[in-house]
UniProtKB/Swiss-Prot annotation:
Transmembrane segments: none annotated. Belongs to the bacterial ribosomal protein bL33 family. PANTHER family: 50S RIBOSOMAL PROTEIN L33, CHLOROPLASTIC, LARGE RIBOSOMAL SUBUNIT PROTEIN BL33C. It holds the Pfam family Ribosomal_L33. GO terms for biological process: translation. The keyword Ribosomal protein applies. PROSITE patterns: RIBOSOMAL_L33. GO terms for molecular function: structural constituent of ribosome. The keyword Ribosomal protein applies. This is Large ribosomal subunit protein bL33. It comes from Aquifex aeolicus (strain VF5).
Length: 50
């Protein structure tokens, strides 16, 4: 299967808040999205973690 499940972690508090899928063959770089962190109570950058 080409799509793999990844986890997104907040860059400020380091908590893993979101899971999503991506095609690692088409996009090998790490994903970065601005999403809401309920522990920081604000929108922060969330990065893909292993």
């Amino acid at each position: 299967m080409a799509r793999e499940i990844i986890t997104l972690a907040c860059t400020e508090c380091k908590r893993r808040n979101y899971t999503t899928t991506k095609n690692k063959q088409k996009h090998p770089e790490r994903l970065e999205l601005r999403k809401y962190c309920k522990w920081c109570r604000k929108h922060t950058i969330h990065r893909e973690v292993k």
